[in-house]
Amino acid sequence: MGKTTGFMDYTRKTSTDVPPLERMENFDEFHIWLSREEQQTQAARCMDCGVPFCQAGMMIGGMASGCPLNNLIPEWNDLVYHGKWELALHRLLATNRFPEFTSRVCPALCEAACTCGDVTGSSVTVRENEHAIIETGYAKGWLHAAPPPARTGKSVAVVGSGPSGLSVAEYLNKRGHAVTVFERADRVGGLLMYGIPNMKLDKSVIERRIKLMQAEGVEFRTNMDVGGILAAEELLSSYDAVVLCCGAKQARDLNVPGRDANGVHFAVDYLTSVTRSLLDSKFADGRAINAAGRNVLVIGGGDTGNDCQGTALRQGCTDLVALEMMPQPPKERAASNPWPEWPRVLKVDYGQTECLAKFNKDPRIYQTTVKEFLKDDAGNLTGAVISYLKPERDPETGRTRMVPTGEEFTYDCQLAFIAAGFTGCESYVADAFGVDRTPRGNVADQNFKTNVDKVFVCGDMRRGQSVVVWGLREGRDCAAAVDRYLMGYTNL
């Protein structure tokens, strides 16, 4: 595939970024993408390896290795190298209906499993090749509405319009079923719209795709709180199948003194308020939680915590500290973490890069957690007592846990964002439909079907907190299960 000697002839080259201090002046996407000619050269580095782990999507050590969508990566790399962009688009869309999302926000599991990366030390630029393919497709007019040629007469209600909801709706509509998507928020997109900041995924990209889906026959109904203002019974009586795609939105809280202080927020609530205010009024309405002129504490070191860092910096925070409970990862792979496993190494994301540029420091403090939030007489947050932690083996379970060392310090802050992950789906939708739950708080299923007749579940609501690409895979697989239920067979 590609040029036989490409991985030896060419070095890896990726997009550049707008300088940190400059890009923090706005909420725009900041990648400066390669030209199509440069991207063709990068595609030539795909090395015709015997076993393309990049597309395997295997679980190794509890983590994914390679693309969960099983994208045909060597195929479309070869087509890009030869300048056959439209054919590359068709091969990409064969497995991934939303590459404009994954090429922006996916952690690139494919690149971590790239054989070229293992052999040469620098993987093929798979994610950026994917971005070039889909954006070339839009620019050339190759993506246009293609409604199904015939309808099956079956109807499906999809509850939730995040990655899995959009994915299951896309595939079921293409199959010919009448699909209606119900979204609780005022805009379609779920996690994509409000859980990911605009500079990471411009909302016009989502809206462009939604318009295409609408033109193909998918109906979207916003401000529809299923299980709240809209009874579950109404959907069950009106549709041939119902798919629950409500995510894992039950945020993990901190049960510490002072948690009720004004200024302590869940991270997703913060990010949602900022994006909504940006879209509604370009911040003129003053409804966004605002970090301007304030010291900010972020609790949690994942993608959401990083997004909080980047958002607070753009708003003009005066200082920033991010707490991470676990020890700092190594800079290089440990012997116990061999390729093609996902590399458990130190990552520097855009939020940390921007903090370094503005405050000359990495905001992260490892092996720490909040012991207590401090507040004044009016109940406003004034600071937090931070405890240092150390790993300790639990004698009963044998697992390692983090316990306080006894060493503490106080950080003066006026805002704190809890980005400690999620514990499962919100209970009221599951309760409204009467579906069973697992001990981990997810909806229980057998091949995406719940214990309730004609009710299915997919995405984070089924598998727990995950990433966008897994939501898309869940939606694709669930659509096949729903189609089989409705038709007695499936060709999805």
Model regions and ranges:
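Phosphate-coordination loops involved in phosphoryl transfer and adenosine-cofactor binding
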Residues: 152-155, 223, 292-295, 367, ...
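Beta1/beta-strand and adjacent pyrophosphate-binding region of the FAD-binding site
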Residues: 151-164, 291-302
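A conserved FAD-binding loop/helix module that cradles the flavin
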Residues: 305-310, 461-489
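C-terminal catalytic lobe of FAD-dependent flavoproteins
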Residues: 13, 18-37, 42-45, 366, ...
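Feature captures the FAD/FMN-dependent oxidoreductase FAD-binding
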Residues: 150, 155-159, 207-256, 371-385, ...
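Glycine/serine-rich phosphate-binding loop and adjoining beta1-alpha1 elements at the start
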Residues: 40, 44, 48-56, 62-149, ...
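Beta1-alpha1 glycine-rich phosphate/pyrophosphate-binding loop at the start
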Residues: 8-32, 41-44, 70-80, 91-92, ...
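FAD-site-proximal beta/loop scaffold in flavoenzymes
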Residues: 260-293, 392-465
